[in-house]
Amino acid sequence: MTMTLSVVAVTHRTAPVTIRERLSLPVEQQCQWLQRWGNQVPEIVLLVTCHRTEVYWLDGEETAHRGVEWLAELGGLTVEELERWVLQRSGAEAVRHAFCVAAGLDSRVVGEPQILGQVRRARDLARAAGTLGPILDRLFSCSLATGRMVRVRAGWSTGKRSLARVAVREAARLCSDLQSARVLVLGAGETGRDVIAALCRCQPAVVWWTNRSPGRLAQIPSEEPVRIVDWSEWPRLVTEADVVFVATNAPEPIVRLEHVTRHARLPRLLVDLAVPRNVDPAISDVPGIRVVTIDDLPADPVPVAAWDGVAVEPYVERAVQRYLRWLEARSIAAEIRAAHETLQSMLERELEKVLRLALRDPARTGEVKRVAAASMARKTLFPLFRALESEPQRVALALRLLAYDR
């Protein structure tokens, strides 16, 4: 049976954060969903980031609707509610999508480095869940290798391209004077650390940094001019800060309406970099406070010239074609194995007939051999003759190959 590779994706290009956050879930739950879906298809991988939730799978037929049903169930939505936000691809287009994602070409900030780690973790999680097979393993491994090479060739490996840098740049634009501002950062994951690094280049008046697990804060280089504070302090500091960046893994808002309405002094700007959102959307209605979500940030403020004139897309396309050729060769190899098994079974049956007849009448052994040989030839060539009218060139090639040893 021919396998079809498919992907369904809800991304920053297709859906707002209000939809994407419904499809965001912690690693433990991702593994559970993989194992649940893995009972239905031979191979499946789930990729979840703040910008996208994507399901890649292998099936015996083109069944993109199955992936939409999976995502709808995951997000507690109906298929009708979700399908307008879903990107669906299969075959070569699904492969091309995977390579573009890993290369950072489909990212909100083109070339951002986080996507490589996220794609790698998705592959490794599927392997741990027992849902990664040879086709998707090769797809993700090749796309990761291509993504790493693209970053080097395009000069993106310097680490200067990230959503955190965009967020700090946008905060500086909205505040007009970030250097005199007091800034609070909640979260010490990859995004939170990137925010701290970007802030240190701007030199605000004060930078407070806190995290629920203090151990992660201890990893910050000592030269960074940041005041590390206890997690219990942030509700007080949120009203003393001019700008607040929130980037935690909390599954629901942690900065709520009561945190900003109890006090006379309010922060001017709240930047929510989390999905699901960590800032209560109701705070947007409080006069004097501006809430910026991940969708409000500029898509990619870095000009195309930052690519240093490197033709990135053709390089990715060549990698896509290499994978597709491997996939085709693997498919043909499977067909050859199936044909071999069929022919072997047929030959064994004919030989059994020959042996039975030869034992009954040894004098007719030669005649029996000729009859059996003719029967085997007819059965071998019959499928080719049947396809002669629709695919004469392929049949001619097959016949030439069968006669190759003459």
Swiss-Prot record:
Presence of keyword Repeat: no
Catalytic activities: (S)-4-amino-5-oxopentanoate + tRNA(Glu) + NADP(+) = L-glutamyl-tRNA(Glu) + NADPH + H(+)
EC number: 1.2.1.70
Important for activity, annotated site positions: H97
UniProt xrefs under InterPro entries: 4pyrrol_synth_GluRdtase, 4pyrrol_synth_GluRdtase_dimer, 4pyrrol_synth_GluRdtase_N, GluRdtase_CS, GluRdtase_N_sf, NAD(P)-bd_dom_sf, Shikm_DH/Glu-tRNA_Rdtase
Pathway: Porphyrin-containing compound metabolism; protoporphyrin-IX biosynthesis; 5-aminolevulinate from L-glutamyl-tRNA(Glu): step 1/2
Pfam families registered for this protein in UniProt: GlutR_dimer, GlutR_N, Shikimate_DH
Enzyme class: oxidoreductase
Gene Ontology biological-process annotations: protoporphyrinogen IX biosynthetic process from glutamate
Active site per database record: C50 (nucleophile)
Binding site for NADP(+): G187, A188, G189, E190, T191, G192
Binding of substrate, residues: T49, C50, H51, R52, S107, E112, P113, Q114, Q118
GO molecular-function terms, A-Z: glutamyl-tRNA reductase activity; NADP binding
Coiled coil, from the record: none
PROSITE patterns associated with the record: GLUTR (PS00747)
Keywords: NADP, Oxidoreductase, Porphyrin biosynthesis
NCBIfam families associated with the record: hemA
Subunit text: Homodimer.
Family: Belongs to the glutamyl-tRNA reductase family.
Function of the molecule: Catalyzes the NADPH-dependent reduction of glutamyl-tRNA(Glu) to glutamate 1-semialdehyde (GSA).
Note: During catalysis, the active site Cys acts as a nucleophile attacking the alpha-carbonyl group of tRNA-bound glutamate with the formation of a thioester intermediate between enzyme and glutamate, and the concomitant release of tRNA(Glu). The thioester intermediate is finally reduced by direct hydride transfer from NADPH, to form the product GSA.
Domain notes from UniProt: Possesses an unusual extended V-shaped dimeric structure with each monomer consisting of three distinct domains arranged along a curved 'spinal' alpha-helix. The N-terminal catalytic domain specifically recognizes the glutamate moiety of the substrate. The second domain is the NADPH-binding domain, and the third C-terminal domain is responsible for dimerization.
Stated name of the protein: Glutamyl-tRNA reductase
Encoding gene (name): hemA
